[in-house]
């Protein structure tokens, strides 16, 4: 991977992360029970990755660094949920409903389980 690609990913990721932080700082205090900033980041990312995939599909003349900046960098920094959404919708559009269910179940359940395991690991390490 070249320097331009790395720079594109890094710059996009920084901007995406800053936007996610801004969503959290601005929206999370409005309704503390449901982190609206995270929801806004995930919904925005899902929408934008769909738009980006379609845009880059029809504008293949753009340099690969543009896609890396937008999708891998910016949307990856904003949320990885956008990638999950794009992959799931792709399976749905292909009519692969069983795999769609498996992917949804794996991502959601896996993320929750890993979060719990992470919490438990840190708690265990703090006690030993």
From Swiss-Prot:
Compartment list: Cell inner membrane
GO terms under biological process: cellular detoxification of fluoride
GO molecular function: fluoride channel activity; metal ion binding
Catalytic activity line of the entry: fluoride(in) = fluoride(out)
Top-level taxon of origin: Bacteria
InterPro entries: FluC
Tagged with keyword Manganese: no
PANTHER family in the record: FLUORIDE EXPORT PROTEIN 1-RELATED (PTHR28259:SF1)
NCBIfam families: crcB, PRK14196.1
Family, per entry: Belongs to the fluoride channel Fluc/FEX (TC 1.A.43) family.
Function: Fluoride-specific ion channel. Important for reducing fluoride concentration in the cell, thus reducing its toxicity.
Name the UniProt record assigns to this protein: Fluoride-specific ion channel FluC
Organism (species): Nitrosospira multiformis (strain ATCC 25196 / NCIMB 11849 / C 71)
Primary gene name: fluC
């Amino acid at each position: 991977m070249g320097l331009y690609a790395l720079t594109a990913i890094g710059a996009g990721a920084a901007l995406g992360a800053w936007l996610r932080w801004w969503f959290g700082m601005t929206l999370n205090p409005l309704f503390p029970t449901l982190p609206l900033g995270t929801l806004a980041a995930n919904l925005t990312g899902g929408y934008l990755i769909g738009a980006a995939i379609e845009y880059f599909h029809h504008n293949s003349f753009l340099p690969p660094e543009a896609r890396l900046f937008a999708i891998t960098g910016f949307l990856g920094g904003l949320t990885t949920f956008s990638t999950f959404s794009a992959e799931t919708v792709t399976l749905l559009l292909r009519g692969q409903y069983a795999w769609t269910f498996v992917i949804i179940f794996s991502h959601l359940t896996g993320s929750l389980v890993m979060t719990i395991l992470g919490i438990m690991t840190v708690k265990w390490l703090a006690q030993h």
